[in-house]
């Protein structure tokens, strides 16, 4: 769903439905914009079932929003999603927008929604009409003891808008973080660590952490790791549980 066979010809490409001609031509010629391609074509790993592990660990639920896409969508957008081999596992998109609450305050305020619309995917071409604006997250849940393989998903050009996110494992440096944050366009920006995900207002991050994020994400990764070590998770359930905690920046209650 993300590359052409070497023997594919321009004549064959031009016989494709109109939407795919430009996409296939860019893939063949190597002219797919690098910024777009990094987030539109990703291999998504499996994450453990938060409901199973909340019961097993006797804790509150961790987040199921482990797989950020870095792609924002608007209500009524029609998007194409190309899904590779799912290896028999169910996979879906969840669109996370905003909700209004009054928790802890006398008046209502806005915060990131705890959940959103879910769109189930199949292998091959999926056409989806988005119901509400937000950012897309891939939902890929599996028993990690079955050694699930990553799933490649391609959300092609013209489907949503790339806003990006920072992945500590992949991007590694403050310099790359600053670059990604400066290019982002959505209201919220994601930072994915080993144990923790920040999903904060981009405007506030530009004000307060424009060029440096490593110390903060390392600190919170370490705090979660220490908590899990005290609970015996790594010792008793090694390589079985890998969900993140998910931190948001509500517009009230503080």
Residue ranges of model-derived segments:
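Alpha-helix capping and helix-coil boundary motifs
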Residues: 17, 172-173, 209-212
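Low-complexity, Pro/Ser/Thr- and charge-rich linker/hinge segments at domain boundaries
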Residues: 154-190
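Catalytic cores of extracellular degradative/oxidative enzymes
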Residues: 178-180, 187-254
